[in-house]
Amino acid sequence: MYRVFVFDLDGTLLNDSLEISEKDRKVIERLSRNCHVVFASGRMLVSTLNVEKKYFGRTFPTIAYNGAMVYIPEEGVILNEKVPPEVAKDIVEYVKQFNVHWQAYIDDVLYSEKDNEEIRGYAKHSSVEYRVEPKLLELVSKVGTTKILLIDTPEKLDELKKILLEKFNNVVKVFKSFPTYLEIVPENVDKGKALRFLRERMGWKKEEIVVFGDNENDLFMFEE
């Protein structure tokens, strides 16, 4: 019998207007009375929790950053993985030659080198604030980053994905969370591994879990 329900946000629960329908909200509310509800997103933790608070007035066990961060209401963040500083430096220096927008996430804060259309659009989509840091490469080279996100056309990102997988395959995972978003996260990170971590922490059985998702980054949860 299923008693744990895991929901992706963008493209799954959130509609084209980035809203959860009243019908879906009521279903999740009913589920949460007798079962466990988990949200699993590529979004920042603050962005995911904001959605939960907006529609449900509280937070739930949450997988953020495509598995790099795990949160539970009782304790806060219980998992926080990062791309190491030296790896982040190598990747950013490499992708900059392709003239693609890149952004980084440090301590659940969004950073961009430039205040451009891409970062403004992303911040609006995710309902988060951002900081412009012209020396962002220098910053990630010192402290690392939870993830790196590239934003460009689907075709350009498909090509970049192939290139990055060949060059950095042993140190990071590279996958798309949206046609125009290419995610770069620590090698040991994905939504499936984060779900396994949460399942073991909470004492849930694998056969009790059902997952809802729509994109490449959600496949790891189905495989788990």
Regions flagged by a language model, labelled:
Residues 34-37, 58-60, 147, 207-208, ...:
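Short active-site oxyanion
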Residues 1, 27, 47-48, 87, ...:
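Hydrophobic alpha-helical segments typical of transmembrane helices
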Residues 13, 37, 62, 184, ...:
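Conserved SAM-binding loop
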